[in-house]
Curated annotation (Swiss-Prot):
Transmembrane segments: none annotated. InterPro entries: YaaA. GO terms for biological process: response to hydroperoxide. This is UPF0246 protein LSEI_2080. Belongs to the UPF0246 family. GO terms for cellular component: cytosol. It comes from Lacticaseibacillus paracasei (strain ATCC 334 / BCRC 17002 / CCUG 31169 / CIP 107868 / KCTC 3260 / NRRL B-441) (Lactobacillus paracasei). It comes from the Bacteria. Pfam families: H2O2_YaaD (PF03883).
Length: 247
């Protein structure tokens, strides 16, 4: 069983408490993308990122100084968005950290796909950003089926905890033999099911921590996810979607 999650826009240079254990599988390709980005003007970068002047200046300065081989920190501690805060990987025991290195993959616009302890540097590039590429229509086309192929080499079903933007990099390449299971966290609003992004991000992080803490190996075990906000709904769930409804 392997989980896929989205990265976070907000990144930090993590402390040295947890060392880098591996290098990104597609670091060479990430280097190509970084070089293209470093050639952008300030205005082009701002248009790419859709950021304010202040945030663009910070990100642009960081971009010009970026070197994928220096000052790396483990990916799982470098992303600091809500999902990662609620995952709280720094609170996992050693066995839990081994579990996420084996079972968790982070999809990335720059790096393609990452293991939790792959060494990364802060960057700003979402999969849906319209980076001008010489031989490809967009980043989805650039990455092609490589992210799927990396997952296909791992045994068991794919548990999708990623946003639609990132799951879109995997879905077109799924084969009939693949078991791809979406996880949905929803609220009932006026008789309809609605996803509340912030709460969903929290729950995704908590589910990864739950799986790692209990060393889960079967998708069915996720039904027992102990969430303070959501409860598994067997009536709405199917073989390809696990649905959790707000309590």
């Amino acid at each position: 069983m392997k989980f896929i999650i989205a990265p976070a826009k907000k990144m930090i240079r993590a402390q040295d408490d947890f060392p880098v254990q591996s290098q990104p599988k597609y670091r060479a390709q990430a280097g190509e993308l970084l070089l293209l980005m470093q050639q952008l003007t300030f205005s082009e970068a701002q248009a790419l990122w859709h950021t304010s002047d202040k945030l663009t200046q910070t990100a642009y300065n960081q971009l010009q100084q970026s070197d994928l081989t220096r000052q790396q920190s483990p990916a799982i501690f470098s992303y600091s968005g809500i999902q990662y805060q609620y995952m709280a990987p720094d609170l996992l025991d050693d066995a839990g950290l081994v579990y996420i290195q084996q079972h968790l993959r982070i999809l990335s616009g720059l790096y393609g796909i990452l293991r939790p302890f792959d060494g990364v540097v802060p960057y700003r590039l979402e999969m849906q950003n319209h980076l001008r590429l010489p031989h490809h229509r967009n980043l989805y086309d650039f990455w092609g089926n490589r992210l799927y192929q990396a997952l296909a080499r791992m045994p068991g079903p794919i548990i999708n905890l990623a946003s639609d933007e990132y799951a879109k990099a995997i879905r077109p390449y799924l084969q009939a033999k693949d078991q791809f299971i979406d996880v949905r966290f929803a609220h009932r609003v006026n008789g309809q099911l609605k996803t509340r992004a912030t709460y969903a991000k929290m729950a995704r992080g908590e589910m990864i921590r739950f799986a790692a803490s209990h060393r889960l190996t079967k998708a069915a075990d996720l039904k027992n996810f102990d969430s303070p906000t959501y409860r598994f709904d067997s009536h709405l769930s199917t073989a390809t979607q696990l649905v959790f409804i707000a309590k």
